[in-house]
Amino acid sequence: MTNDKEADERQSFIAEARREQIIEATIATLDEIGYVNASLAQIAKRAGISTPLISYHFSDKNDLINQTLTTLLSEANAYVTERLKEGSTAREKLRIFIEARLAYQGTHSKHNVALIEIVFNARTPDNVPYYKLSDDGEDPVVYALEQLLTEGQASGEFREFDIHAMASAIQGAIGEYLADQYLIAIVSLETYCAEIFEIFDRATKADRR
């Protein structure tokens, strides 16, 4: 029984490693040739495996794309939420949030391109573009941002404002940089990050008069 269990665990580990390899190849393919041209054959080529092997781990291209999207979002979310633990005040957490969101994408450009390719090109079985879908659940990063804004108001660090509106504005400013190649070319990540924090630091700061 022990040998059978060890064999099963080894097979499970190998299968998971192969799935991760295929997802990484999918990210690279989306970055290099875009969603429209990202066939299973192209993905297999970059993974260094046969095309049928992908079908062993994923039911079809849509399944692979959805799993890749889940991976992209979970990795980015984990990075930001882990960094937020470094802050002790709401203001510090706001700075860290902005820095972390921008820094992660700045150091994971392929992941950012792959995410954009999926969101703006993939469709549901009902032919609805992914970017038009409403969120079924709470986004961990948005939740973390709204929580730190709420904490800031409760502690008196931040003025009174609508939490959802402010969180949306902050997310929008971050997303604008990540999606605008011209802006990226003329404004450094560090400069944009500093300016965005300055803007929202002033926008959220409590009136001390």
Tell where the protein language model's regions lie, with residue ranges.
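C-terminal peripheral helix-coil segments that are non-catalytic and often amphipathic
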Residues: 1-6, 96, 103, 139-155, ...
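Hydrophobic alpha-helical connector segments
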Residues: 67, 71, 81-111, 166-170, ...
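Helix-loop "lid/cap" segments that line or gate small-molecule binding pockets
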Residues: 83, 99-106, 116-124, 153, ...
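Amphipathic alpha-helical packing segments from all-alpha helical-bundle domains
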Residues: 74-77, 81-82, 107, 114-117, ...
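Short hydrophobic clusters on alpha-helical segments that form packing/core surfaces
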Residues: 18, 22-30, 101, 200
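Helix-turn-helix
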Residues: 21, 29-63, 67
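Generic hydrophobic, amphipathic alpha-helix propensity
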Residues: 18-26, 43, 68-72, 76, ...
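Short coil/turn segments at alpha/beta junctions that flank glycine-rich nucleotide-binding fingerprints
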Residues: 32-36, 87, 108, 155
